[in-house]
Regions:
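Alpha-helical transmembrane segments and immediately membrane-proximal extracytoplasmic
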Residues: 1-186
Protein backbone atom coordinates (compact mmCIF):
# COMPACT_ATOMS: atom_id res chain seq x y z
CA UNK A 1 0.00 0.00 0.00
CA UNK A 2 0.85 3.63 -0.13
CA UNK A 3 2.45 5.08 2.97
CA UNK A 4 1.68 8.70 3.73
CA UNK A 5 3.88 10.98 5.84
CA UNK A 6 2.97 11.00 9.55
CA UNK A 7 2.49 14.79 9.59
CA UNK A 8 0.96 15.25 6.17
CA UNK A 9 0.63 19.00 5.74
CA UNK A 10 -0.59 20.86 2.72
CA UNK A 11 1.99 23.23 1.37
CA UNK A 12 1.04 26.83 1.92
CA UNK A 13 2.38 29.74 -0.07
CA UNK A 14 4.51 31.98 2.10
CA UNK A 15 7.19 34.56 1.57
CA UNK A 16 10.42 33.86 3.43
CA UNK A 17 10.50 37.56 4.29
CA UNK A 18 7.33 37.09 6.35
CA UNK A 19 9.00 34.62 8.70
CA UNK A 20 12.66 35.62 8.74
CA UNK A 21 12.31 37.52 12.03
CA UNK A 22 10.47 34.60 13.62
CA UNK A 23 13.10 32.16 12.40
CA UNK A 24 15.76 34.43 13.88
CA UNK A 25 13.94 34.12 17.20
CA UNK A 26 13.39 30.36 16.92
CA UNK A 27 17.08 29.62 16.32
CA UNK A 28 18.51 30.85 19.64
CA UNK A 29 15.46 29.73 21.63
CA UNK A 30 15.68 26.25 20.08
CA UNK A 31 19.32 26.09 21.13
CA UNK A 32 18.36 27.08 24.68
CA UNK A 33 15.56 24.48 24.81
CA UNK A 34 17.87 21.77 23.41
CA UNK A 35 20.67 22.58 25.86
CA UNK A 36 18.24 22.72 28.77
CA UNK A 37 16.73 19.40 27.68
CA UNK A 38 20.08 17.63 27.40
CA UNK A 39 21.38 19.03 30.68
CA UNK A 40 18.16 18.13 32.47
CA UNK A 41 18.39 14.55 31.18
CA UNK A 42 21.99 14.32 32.39
CA UNK A 43 21.11 15.88 35.74
CA UNK A 44 18.14 13.60 36.41
CA UNK A 45 20.38 10.65 35.57
CA UNK A 46 22.54 11.52 38.58
CA UNK A 47 19.68 11.87 41.07
CA UNK A 48 19.10 8.15 41.84
CA UNK A 49 22.74 7.64 42.84
CA UNK A 50 22.82 10.84 44.90
CA UNK A 51 19.83 9.86 47.01
CA UNK A 52 20.68 6.14 47.21
CA UNK A 53 17.88 4.80 45.03
CA UNK A 54 18.56 1.25 43.88
CA UNK A 55 18.66 0.53 40.15
CA UNK A 56 15.42 -1.43 40.26
CA UNK A 57 13.61 1.33 42.19
CA UNK A 58 14.41 4.22 39.85
CA UNK A 59 12.15 3.09 36.96
CA UNK A 60 9.33 2.48 39.45
CA UNK A 61 9.62 6.08 40.63
CA UNK A 62 9.64 7.31 37.02
CA UNK A 63 6.59 5.15 36.28
CA UNK A 64 4.82 6.62 39.29
CA UNK A 65 5.66 10.14 38.03
CA UNK A 66 4.24 9.20 34.61
CA UNK A 67 1.08 7.85 36.20
CA UNK A 68 0.49 10.98 38.27
CA UNK A 69 1.26 13.22 35.31
CA UNK A 70 -0.95 11.11 33.06
CA UNK A 71 -3.91 11.65 35.35
CA UNK A 72 -3.38 15.41 35.32
CA UNK A 73 -1.84 16.25 31.93
CA UNK A 74 -1.81 13.20 29.67
CA UNK A 75 -0.79 15.18 26.58
CA UNK A 76 2.89 14.96 27.57
CA UNK A 77 2.94 11.14 27.70
CA UNK A 78 4.22 8.95 24.87
CA UNK A 79 5.35 10.08 21.44
CA UNK A 80 2.80 12.87 21.30
CA UNK A 81 2.11 12.59 17.58
CA UNK A 82 -1.56 13.51 17.91
CA UNK A 83 -0.79 16.41 20.22
CA UNK A 84 1.98 17.57 17.89
CA UNK A 85 -0.39 17.47 14.93
CA UNK A 86 -2.85 19.57 16.93
CA UNK A 87 -0.10 22.03 17.84
CA UNK A 88 0.89 22.36 14.18
CA UNK A 89 -2.61 22.82 12.79
CA UNK A 90 -4.56 24.59 15.56
CA UNK A 91 -3.85 27.89 17.25
CA UNK A 92 -3.67 26.97 20.94
CA UNK A 93 -3.40 29.21 23.99
CA UNK A 94 0.04 30.38 25.04
CA UNK A 95 -0.32 29.03 28.59
CA UNK A 96 -1.30 25.59 27.33
CA UNK A 97 1.65 25.51 24.92
CA UNK A 98 4.03 26.60 27.66
CA UNK A 99 2.66 23.88 29.96
CA UNK A 100 3.19 21.31 27.18
CA UNK A 101 6.77 22.48 26.72
CA UNK A 102 7.63 22.35 30.42
CA UNK A 103 5.71 19.13 31.05
CA UNK A 104 7.37 17.21 28.22
CA UNK A 105 10.77 18.59 29.12
CA UNK A 106 10.53 17.57 32.76
CA UNK A 107 8.73 14.24 32.35
CA UNK A 108 11.00 12.99 29.56
CA UNK A 109 14.06 13.96 31.58
CA UNK A 110 12.77 12.10 34.63
CA UNK A 111 11.89 9.00 32.62
CA UNK A 112 15.21 8.75 30.79
CA UNK A 113 17.26 9.84 33.78
CA UNK A 114 15.59 7.26 36.02
CA UNK A 115 16.17 4.38 33.65
CA UNK A 116 13.25 4.13 31.26
CA UNK A 117 14.23 3.06 27.79
CA UNK A 118 13.48 5.62 25.15
CA UNK A 119 15.07 8.13 22.90
CA UNK A 120 15.49 11.85 22.72
CA UNK A 121 14.55 12.41 19.10
CA UNK A 122 10.77 12.20 19.35
CA UNK A 123 10.60 14.40 22.47
CA UNK A 124 12.90 16.87 20.69
CA UNK A 125 10.46 17.03 17.77
CA UNK A 126 7.63 17.59 20.22
CA UNK A 127 9.49 20.33 22.10
CA UNK A 128 10.46 22.05 18.86
CA UNK A 129 6.94 21.97 17.45
CA UNK A 130 5.56 23.46 20.64
CA UNK A 131 8.32 26.09 20.69
CA UNK A 132 7.47 27.08 17.11
CA UNK A 133 3.80 27.40 18.06
CA UNK A 134 4.79 29.59 21.01
CA UNK A 135 6.87 31.83 18.71
CA UNK A 136 3.84 32.08 16.44
CA UNK A 137 2.01 33.77 19.33
CA UNK A 138 4.39 36.73 19.16
CA UNK A 139 2.97 39.89 17.56
CA UNK A 140 5.58 39.79 14.79
CA UNK A 141 4.08 36.61 13.29
CA UNK A 142 0.49 36.37 14.46
CA UNK A 143 -0.75 38.40 11.48
CA UNK A 144 -0.73 35.41 9.13
CA UNK A 145 -2.44 32.30 10.58
CA UNK A 146 -0.95 30.12 7.83
CA UNK A 147 2.51 30.59 9.30
CA UNK A 148 1.69 28.51 12.39
CA UNK A 149 2.54 25.23 10.70
CA UNK A 150 5.67 26.65 9.07
CA UNK A 151 7.01 27.95 12.38
CA UNK A 152 6.07 24.77 14.27
CA UNK A 153 7.85 22.58 11.72
CA UNK A 154 10.84 24.95 11.75
CA UNK A 155 10.96 24.63 15.54
CA UNK A 156 10.84 20.84 15.23
CA UNK A 157 13.83 20.89 12.91
CA UNK A 158 15.76 23.38 15.03
CA UNK A 159 15.42 21.61 18.38
CA UNK A 160 15.83 18.09 17.00
CA UNK A 161 18.93 19.03 14.99
CA UNK A 162 20.49 20.49 18.14
CA UNK A 163 19.64 17.44 20.25
CA UNK A 164 20.83 14.83 17.75
CA UNK A 165 23.68 17.02 16.48
CA UNK A 166 22.82 16.56 12.82
CA UNK A 167 21.16 19.55 11.11
CA UNK A 168 21.09 18.05 7.61
CA UNK A 169 19.50 14.89 8.95
CA UNK A 170 16.84 16.99 10.67
CA UNK A 171 16.02 18.76 7.40
CA UNK A 172 15.67 15.44 5.58
CA UNK A 173 13.52 14.07 8.40
CA UNK A 174 11.22 17.11 8.21
CA UNK A 175 10.90 16.45 4.49
CA UNK A 176 10.03 12.82 5.21
CA UNK A 177 7.62 13.63 8.06
CA UNK A 178 5.70 16.33 6.22
CA UNK A 179 6.08 15.26 2.61
CA UNK A 180 6.63 18.92 1.76
CA UNK A 181 9.72 20.42 0.18
CA UNK A 182 8.49 23.90 1.14
CA UNK A 183 8.50 23.02 4.84
CA UNK A 184 11.94 21.41 4.61
CA UNK A 185 13.57 24.53 3.19
CA UNK A 186 11.88 26.82 5.72
Amino acid sequence: GIVSPPLLLTAIPFDMGDIIISLGIIGPLAAIVAILFMRLVLFTGTIPAKINIKNWQAPIIAGFACGICGMIFSEVLGLGTDVLMSVITTQLLFGYLFALLLGKLILTSICIGFGFFGGLFSPALFLGGVLGAIIFQLPVTAANPDLLSVLAVSGMAAVSSSVIGAPLTAIILVLELTGSYEYAIA
